Amino acid sequence: MSDRKDGAGAPAARAFLAILDRNLRDLYPGYPAFVMATGIISNALYFLEMFGLSQLFFVINLVAYPILMTAIAIRLVRHTAALWADLLNPRLVFSFFTIVAATDVLGIQCDLRGYANASIALWLFAFTTWFVLLYFSFAVLSFLNTALDANVVHGGWLIAIVGTQSLVLLGVRVADHWIAYSTGLIVLAHMLWGIGLALYAIFVTLFSYRTFFFKLTPDDLSPLLWVVMGAAAISANAGTSLLLSGAHVPYLTSMNPFVDGVTLIVWAWGTWWIPLLVFFGVWKHVVCRVPLSYSPALWSLVFPLGMYSVATFRFSLASQFPFLGYLGREFIWVAVPAWLATACAMIVSNLRGLKKSNMSRDCQGRPGQLPSG
């Protein structure tokens, strides 16, 4: 009888491995946004002194991050062609910057809990990945982009800015641990902040041109649209981190009024986008009646909500505007339900996909059997 069970279990195991392998082959390159969304909510709750909830999200990331990095590594080895196809696609290549941002967000989580060595290692990995991806992605855009107009532009491109500014956020913290390199790291953080702002100005100009002066369809209004707001929010948060870093470099200290003013502008710009993005969502799902469904890109909507909460709360500390602190504290209760809803949708979607695959396997295994009834 045990032999019969083993014989029945072997095909099931092979089928499961085949499904897993297929999912790895088709893995969405922006899936690390799950770690980004989970981590930023954890950090927001930590700053708001809700340490128990924050720790729960931290534990989730401690499990999710190595799983996702392992999945990406396996995809690189087993499905190299599929990975390269995504890397060489101008519409997808910038999604790989979620690896940078996810690593930095986890690094901040570690640093808040006193794991300095882990945060340093994660920052070094994130910076190296960012450096390679930045020049590679612009090479793809320059030499492999066959689109002759702005239709190739979408909100996902701005994940490159999110990755850049996340290096600032963790880099400022790493500077406190690497005393010998502290000044250099703070200077580098200011440089990265400036690069992120320059890239944001370029991309958001192209994106706004595409959005406001071309015909929009419901398919154009994906959750990645929210990265436009998220990139502004993380730029404001990075500026706040520079202001609060207390760097004793005369030249950089003299730049504080400029950093303060630009931080206010990008925070206001990100705030301006929120009602418009909600309106776009209503138009797509209510007016055009496109049903809500789960896709991994939804995590790129959750992350900006959490980042806006953190950016607003921390900017209130730097600017000494108490009402912004209240707004930041309350906005986290928009982000947390969004995370919970997306997580539930992800679980249900994956279970349905697994059930569908099992049903397909069963039908293939019994080709001569007719359906009953």
What are these regions (language model features)?
Residues 160-280:
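Generic multipass alpha-helical transmembrane bundles of integral membrane proteins
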Residues 2-73, 78:
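N-terminal signal-anchor module of multipass membrane proteins
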Residues 24-45, 95-106, 155-173, 228-241, ...:
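The first (N-terminal) embedded transmembrane alpha-helix
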Residues 51-126:
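Membrane helical hairpin/interfacial module
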Residues 17-34, 85-93, 142-164, 192, ...:
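Cytoplasm-facing juxtamembrane segments at the starts of transmembrane helices
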Residues 84-91, 108-164, 169-193, 214-218:
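Membrane-interface helix-loop-helix junctions at boundaries between adjacent transmembrane segments
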Residues 37, 42-43, 67-71, 75, ...:
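C-terminal transmembrane-bundle signature of multipass membrane proteins
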Residues 56-69, 119-132, 187-200, 263-272, ...:
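Structural signature of hydrophobic alpha-helical transmembrane segments
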